[in-house]
Amino acid sequence: MAAVSLSVSTVKPLGDRVFVKVSESEEKTAGGILLPDTAKEKPQVGEVVQVGPGKRNDDGSRQAPEVGVGDNVLYSKYAGTDIKLGSDEYVLLSEKDILAVVN
């Protein structure tokens, strides 16, 4: 079996799934103390980089996703599947796990 090379352009979400690049977590506290990786909270904000075709309705048609590529979104803390590509962190979410689009 040949090895598969993963990149953002090769990941195509299915159904109502959304591929999000996770925003960087804070390195320092407000007082200037550096945080070790174990003390950092998991970020809940990221930028949408790929969107699936949408959820299938009962009649077989597709419901268009409410988010699009480039949107910044707030998502549930423990939602999705974490994926690391190179040095960047991503999460593959179901659209229902997205709480809001943020500007």
Swiss-Prot record:
InterPro entries: Chaperonin_GroES, Chaperonin_GroES_sf, Chaprnonin_Cpn10_CS, GroES-like_sf. Gene3D superfamilies: GroES chaperonin (2.30.33.40). SMART domains: Cpn10. It comes from the Bacteria. Keywords: Chaperone, Cytoplasm. Signal peptide: none annotated. GO terms for cellular component: cytoplasm. Pfam families: Cpn10 (PF00166). One of its GO terms (molecular function) is protein folding chaperone. GO terms for biological process: chaperone cofactor-dependent protein refolding. PROSITE patterns: CHAPERONINS_CPN10 (PS00681). CDD domains: cpn10. It is found in: Cytoplasm. Belongs to the GroES chaperonin family. NCBIfam families: PRK00364.1-6, PRK00364.2-2, PRK00364.2-4, PRK00364.2-5. Heptamer of 7 subunits arranged in a ring. Interacts with the chaperonin GroEL. Together with the chaperonin GroEL, plays an essential role in assisting protein folding. The GroEL-GroES system forms a nano-cage that allows encapsulation of the non-native substrate proteins and provides a physical environment optimized to promote and accelerate protein folding. GroES binds to the apical surface of the GroEL ring, thereby capping the opening of the GroEL channel. This is Co-chaperonin GroES. It comes from Synechococcus sp. (strain CC9605).
